């Protein structure tokens, strides 16, 4: 196979490559065997037409397209490898010549990975807004959240105030006509929770059990049900009960109810302080790492980022997001209906970060290359075992899902990130 590459523009060019007859002939045989089972010819049983008869009747050229589909992937990948090109995105393949008995010549318009000119990426000094310090107020707030989780709702006679829970029936209508989803019975609503559309909960403050309140609201313009968006609605609401939240006393008994491993409130606070310190330490390290990587990317120069790389990243990100939604039982149609968005909106949302992620990956890859990082067999094996433990999967299943090249790439990328972050300091 002969190959050549011609630059056409920055990060773009054309590969010309040939496919020899010793590769074409087996591909033609495969193509014939694939289609002959459906062939009928006088004097032959279906699927048993001899190759010479086929060639005489239809011509060998009929097999070329199928044969090319068989032989092309390996031929193209071989040309890319021989030319040592780092290709991104799908190529545009064109046939130059496909003559009987001759080698086939093809071209591939390709986009290549852009050149990265690294700037400073070691000993960086960065701004980190996160703090490692844990305050008494943060500890008290965590105790208070757990205390509220143990609160009980007690029926009261007085009028409802914000924070109370009301048990209601409601019937909604627009222009006097009831609408789907606008009716509820014995619904528990915490006033001030924001569960209902703006303005609804506020109008129930002051209501008592037995009251009927006419709640008038306007649906938001971006409401997910388009037929209701921006429209004025009336909800006839009957209050059955008003319940106040009663929280337990803040004492040692509460501490033991929250966490059976402690005996006193002071012990609970000390435990929460340690947990918060560990959490804030991790958040600080993440913030330092993120800021250092961001600065390393800013310090680098990327020569004309191909738009195809960004488009591919957007599609990858969107597909990953939708797969995550479906694992939660939310179909694409359901997601778009609930959020009042479209496929186009979702792509636009992901475009904002796609450009940044592509640039970041390119710079980290360039650092790994500059540092000469490689992945040993032992490191690959450790990575497989770590992933198996993290996702509770059999080691062999992880090995079958991830190629050695993917694992090597992940390992050297982690090493490059470590180079950036290990020497970074906060201002």
Curated annotation (Swiss-Prot):
> What PROSITE patterns does the entry give?
FKBP_PPIASE
Positions of the PPIase FKBP-type domain = 163-248
Naturally occurring in which organism (per UniProt): Streptococcus equi subsp. zooepidemicus (strain H70)
Coding gene?
Answer: tig
Its predominant location is: cytoplasm
Keywords from UniProt, A to Z, are: Cell cycle, Cell division, Chaperone, Cytoplasm, Isomerase, Rotamase
GO annotations of cellular component type: cytoplasm
Role, per record: Involved in protein export. Acts as a chaperone by maintaining the newly synthesized protein in an open conformation. Functions as a peptidyl-prolyl cis-trans isomerase.
Record GO terms (molecular function):
peptidyl-prolyl cis-trans isomerase activity; protein folding chaperone; ribosome binding
**One GO BP annotation of this record:** protein transport
Catalysed conversion reaction: [protein]-peptidylproline (omega=180) = [protein]-peptidylproline (omega=0)
**Protein known as:** Trigger factor
- The UniProt record lists the keyword Disulfide bond: no
Q: What is its EC number?
A: 5.2.1.8
Q: Which domain of life is it from?
A: Bacteria
Checking Pfam families in the record gives: FKBP_C, Trigger_C, Trigger_N
Family listed: Belongs to the FKBP-type PPIase family. Tig subfamily.
Notes concerning its domains: Consists of 3 domains; the N-terminus binds the ribosome, the middle domain has PPIase activity, while the C-terminus has intrinsic chaperone activity on its own.
The record's subcellular locations are: Cytoplasm
């Amino acid at each position: 196979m002969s190959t050549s590459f011609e630059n056409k523009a920055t990060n773009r060019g054309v590969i010309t490559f040939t496919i020899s007859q010793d590769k074409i002939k087996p591909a033609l045989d495969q193509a014939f065997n694939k289609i002959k089972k459906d062939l009928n010819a006088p004097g032959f049983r279906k699927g048993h037409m001899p190759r010479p008869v086929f060639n005489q009747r239809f011509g060998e050229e009929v097999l070329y397209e199928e044969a090319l589909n068989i032989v092309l992937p390996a031929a193209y990948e071989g040309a890319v490898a021989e030319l040592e090109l780092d290709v991104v995105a799908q190529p545009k393949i064109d046939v130059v010549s496909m003559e009987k008995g001759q080698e086939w010549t093809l071209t591939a318009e390709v986009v290549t990975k852009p050149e990265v000119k690294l700037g400073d990426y070691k000993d960086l000094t960065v701004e980190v807004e996160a703090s490692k310090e844990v305050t008494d107020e943060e500890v008290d707030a965590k105790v208070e959240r757990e205390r509220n989780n143990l609160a009980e709702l007690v029926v009261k006679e007085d009028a409802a105030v914000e924070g109370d829970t009301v048990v209601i029936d409601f019937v909604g209508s627009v222009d006097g006509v009831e609408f789907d989803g606008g009716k509820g019975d014995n619904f528990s609503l915490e006033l001030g929770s924001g569960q209902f559309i703006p303005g609804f909960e506020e109008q129930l403050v002051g209501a008592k059990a037995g009251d009927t309140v006419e709640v008038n609201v306007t649906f938001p313009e971006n409401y997910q049900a388009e037929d209701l968006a921006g429209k004025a609605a009336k909800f006839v609401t009957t209050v059955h009960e008003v319940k106040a939240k009663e929280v337990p006393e803040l004492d040692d008994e509460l501490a033991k109810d929250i966490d059976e491993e402690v005996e006193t409130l002071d012990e609970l606070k000390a435990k929460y302080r340690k947990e918060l310190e560990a959490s804030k330490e991790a958040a600080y390290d993440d913030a330092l790492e993120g800021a250092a990587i961001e600065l390393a990317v800013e310090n680098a120069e990327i020569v004309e980022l191909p738009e195809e790389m960004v488009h591919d990243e957007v599609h990858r990100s969107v597909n990953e997001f939708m797969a995550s939604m479906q694992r939660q039982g939310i179909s694409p149609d359901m997601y778009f209906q609930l959020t009042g968005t479209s496929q186009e909106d979702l792509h636009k949302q992901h475009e904002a970060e796609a450009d940044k992620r592509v640039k970041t990956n390119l710079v980290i890859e360039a650092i790994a290359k500059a540092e000469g990082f490689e992945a040993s067999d032992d490191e690959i094996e450790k990575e497989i075992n770590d992933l198996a433990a993290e996702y509770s999967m059999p080691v062999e299943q992880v090995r079958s899902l991830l190629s050695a090249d993917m694992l090597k790439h992940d390992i050297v990328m982690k090493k490059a990130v470590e180079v950036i972050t290990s020497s970074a300091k906060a201002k």
